[in-house]
Amino acid sequence: MITKTGTTIVGMKYKTGVILAADTRSTQGPVVSDKNCVKIHQITDKIMCCGAGTAADASRVARMASRELRLFQNKYLRLPLVSHFRKVCTQHLHKYGGGIGAALIVGGIDSEGCHLYEIHPHGSENSALFVSLGSGSLGAIATLESRYRAMDKDEAIDLACDAVKAGILNDLYSGSNIDVCVIDYSGVEFLRNYRRIGVSENTDTLVYPLDSVRIKREEVFDIVEEY
């Protein structure tokens, strides 16, 4: 069975950089196959992407585009632009007409500034201040639309986590933990399992006294040994 990421992924710009956030649940139909998978992929030193859809497709597209950008960097001795990654992905996906189940959120910083793009499986793309994709994107985008504003790093991380949490709580295919990636001019900071969602606060074990169960009837059977 094909493994899908289910997914709530979020991207947003803040004052000095870009935030990417994603849940960590992977599913096979109605079954949770992985509670702590990684949906944030590194492309270059300052370009990252989140993947939704079929897990293998999203991962392979990210690896393919990363390879193209690194070849460009080694050949021309220039740092690739975020738009270069966007172009490689959209052209590759468009050739297959939606046959590749990969939806991506791309964030990064280059010589032209901070960039955030959403890329859909058919090859369409869009630039945005904030975006959410995946099966839990409805709850996430509602949170972003109601609370997004000019923010510093800590406020942006909190909003991104709250958006993913809203997606998790309204979508059975999203869940477990929240990974966060912060991209700014100093580099990339990846915060693995930054927040856990749905963990029971009551960790006390239940203890039943031995006399808590009443014995209403007792029968004694003789053991018959047969040789």
UniProtKB/Swiss-Prot annotation:
Checking InterPro entries in the record gives: Ntn_hydrolases_N, Proteasome_bsu_CS, Proteasome_sua/b, Proteasome_suB-type
Q: Which domain of life is it from?
A: Eukaryota
Extract the coiled-coil ranges from the record.
none
Q: Where is the signal peptide?
A: none
Q: Which residues form the active site?
A: 7
Report a single Gene Ontology molecular function: threonine-type endopeptidase activity
Q: Which UniProt keywords apply?
A: Cytoplasm, Hydrolase, Nucleus, Protease, Proteasome, Threonine protease
Pfam assignment, any one = Proteasome
Show the propeptide residue ranges: 1-6
The UniProt entry's GO biological process terms, in alphabetical order, are:
proteolysis involved in protein catabolic process
GO (cellular component) term, any one? cytoplasm
Does the keyword field hold Protease?
A: yes
Q: Where in the cell is it found?
A: Cytoplasm; Nucleus
Entry keyword annotation includes Protease: yes
The principal localisation class reads cytoplasm
EC number(s) per entry? 3.4.25.1
The record's catalysed reaction(s) read: Cleavage of peptide bonds with very broad specificity
The family note in this entry says: Belongs to the peptidase T1B family.
Q: How does it assemble?
A: The 26S proteasome consists of a 20S proteasome core and two 19S regulatory subunits. The 20S proteasome core is composed of 28 subunits that are arranged in four stacked rings, resulting in a barrel-shaped structure. The two end rings are each formed by seven alpha subunits, and the two central rings are each formed by seven beta subunits. The catalytic chamber with the active sites is on the inside of the barrel.
Q: What does this protein do?
A: The proteasome degrades poly-ubiquitinated proteins in the cytoplasm and in the nucleus. It is essential for the regulated turnover of proteins and for the removal of misfolded proteins. The proteasome is a multicatalytic proteinase complex that is characterized by its ability to cleave peptides with Arg, Phe, Tyr, Leu, and Glu adjacent to the leaving group at neutral or slightly basic pH. It has an ATP-dependent proteolytic activity.
Cross-referenced PANTHER family, in alphabetical order?
METALLOPROTEASE TLDD (PTHR32194), PROTEASOME SUBUNIT BETA TYPE-7 (PTHR32194:SF4)
Q: What name does the UniProt record give this protein? A: Probable proteasome subunit beta type-2
